[in-house]
Amino acid sequence: MNYSADSGNTVYVGNIDPRITKEQLYELFIQINPVLRIKYPKDKVLQAYQGYAFIEFYNQGDAQYAIKIMNNTVRLYDRLIKVRQVTNSTGTTNLPSNISKDMILPIAKLFIKNLADSIDSDQLVKIFNKFGKLIREPEIFYLSNGKLKCAYVYFEDFEKADLAIKSLNNQLVANNRITVDYAFKENGKGNAKYGDDVDRLLNKEALKHNMLK
């Protein structure tokens, strides 16, 4: 589901208990910054809230502050709510230059190490899309002063990424034994990698509501 308002000013709130009302969401977020509007979808048949909302603030700074303060810190009916930046329907974002899409999209990012010189991006797609849909083109780069060929591969689904790791890690590909694991997070604390419980929960919700299409 895509939200047509200014994406830079809007946050996605997930893992909401259906007992939470729109008024309660408003009262919660108004404590952080002024709220312009809230979109809180209901199931058309059951008329029950679907567990997620879009909250639009008056400016991008207010939205970013809400993410910083509210994400994974507030518990409603024993559920930690998840707050992330909204992306628009064209796949672009209105984000500050120091924040990349990989930091806010709940996708499965893998780190591939020790690739053979003959392996290019198209070959990586052929190798990895056997396990599941790739959300974007692989990125190839070099470490160790250009001696170690590596890549990032982006899966839409963590379960498919798990399968790729299980099947390909420490296997020979074009006569090179490669390492396949989740990548380190750009904005993570310490050595945090993609694939933790929060990532997987957000990924399932995003897939359920077609937010990665």
Curated annotation (Swiss-Prot):
GO terms for molecular function: RNA binding. One of its GO terms (biological process) is mRNA splicing, via spliceosome. It is found in: Nucleus. Pfam families: RRM_1 (PF00076). It comes from the Eukaryota. The keyword Amino-acid biosynthesis does not apply. Coiled coil: none annotated. Keywords: mRNA processing, Nucleus, Repeat, RNA-binding. Residues 9-88, 108-185 form the RRM domain. The keyword Nucleus applies. One of its GO terms (cellular component) is spliceosomal complex. Its main location: nucleus. Interacts with RDS3. Present with 1240 molecules/cell in log phase SD medium. Possible SF3b-like factor. This is Protein HSH49.
